[in-house]
């Protein structure tokens, strides 16, 4: 594996050890002859700001999902990546250490600041920075506390409708949506709506295209052979939702397992869309490190909207997907 060191940075090995991520690094994914970011990186949230890709994810590779820090990965083409420290849970005043750092999501608020939504202690918190590179400064309290709304409080996300209205998304076992404040630091719990979506497990995501709303999510546990991404379509966020249909499922023929927990992003100024999702760490022999559910990697693929309003199913492959921005 060939890696390129950033200035004032040591070259990392391929052991994928997890540390505090005190230094940025650069890596070229072409050396892998595969699509994924080379580190164990799960629960991806891909965003585009100011002509660059920004990827926020769970730093995987720790037993029992026990990572305690977040990084941000930055690229111009989905191949060459830089990594910067985003948030360490030791800096979060309400973190007790009972659960790790999971499932971050990013949004730019109405003031132009960047808000990182994240899970710790099975609660959802926020942290703020002036740039998407971070580092992010955590707020003093979580915005959704453990045990509220009758579901496991994980997997935050944000949907911004065409009129600028912001919605907060979250849930495990049941999907929830609620109006989100312009500063993206509070939600209106009195207007929260619980959605019944197939066999919803986690990672609710919403996007809009051609006047239709698309809700997508993961079903089953990440270690389950039936773990997959499904979606439904509606003309209104209130429903009714048609579906569900499969969007991403595992490809045992290519030894690609654990495909799920995604997000979807539009390339500004185009009708091109990208889906980011994780899978078990791949090995061509069929031996993979990710069978325990704690060793996952993030991959990317184009997402196509079909004329009938459906989404073309994404079929996991071994191979590169490179999409330079500004082209």
Regions found by a protein language model. Give the residues of each.
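Carbohydrate-active catalytic/glycan-binding domains of CAZyme proteins
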Residues: 1-327
């Amino acid at each position: 594996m060939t890696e390129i060191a950033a200035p004032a940075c040591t070259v990392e090995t391929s052991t994928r050890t997890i540390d505090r991520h005190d230094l940025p690094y650069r890596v070229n994914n072409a050396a892998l002859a595969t699509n994924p970011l080379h580190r164990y990186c799960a629960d991806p949230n891909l965003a585009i700001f100011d002509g660059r890709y920004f990827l926020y994810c769970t730093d995987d590779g720790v037993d029992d999902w026990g990572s305690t820090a977040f990084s941000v990965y930055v690229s111009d083409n989905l191949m060459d990546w830089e990594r910067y420290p985003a948030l360490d849970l030791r800096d979060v005043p309400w973190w007790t250490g009972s659960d790790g750092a999971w499932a971050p999501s990013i949004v730019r608020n109405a003031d132009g600041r960047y808000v990182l939504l994240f899970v710790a202690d099975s609660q959802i918190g926020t942290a703020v920075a002036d740039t998407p590179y971070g580092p992010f400064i955590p707020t003093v309290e979580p915005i959704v506390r453990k045990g509220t709304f009758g579901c496991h409080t994980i997997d935050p996300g944000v949907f911004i409708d065409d009129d600028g209205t912001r919605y907060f998304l979250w849930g495990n076992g049941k999907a929830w949506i609620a109006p989100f404040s312009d500063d993206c630091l509070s939600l209106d719990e009195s207007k929260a709506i619980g959605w019944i979506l197939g066999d919803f497990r986690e990672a609710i995501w919403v996007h809009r295209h051609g006047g239709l709303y698309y809700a997508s999510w993961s079903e089953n546990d990440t270690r389950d052979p039936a773990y997959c991404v499904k979606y439904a379509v509606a003309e209104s966020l209130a429903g009714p939702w048609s579906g569900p249909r499969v969007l991403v499922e595992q490809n045992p023929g290519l030894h690609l397992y654990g495909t799920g927990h995604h997000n979807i992003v539009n390339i500004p100024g185009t009708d091109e869309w990208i889906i980011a999702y994780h899978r078990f760490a791949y090995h061509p022999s069929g031996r993979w490190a990710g069978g325990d559910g704690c060793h996952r990697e993030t991959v990317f693929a184009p997402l196509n909207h079909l004329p009938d309003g459906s989404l073309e199913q994404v079929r996991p492959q071994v191979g590169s997907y490179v999409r330079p921005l500004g082209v």
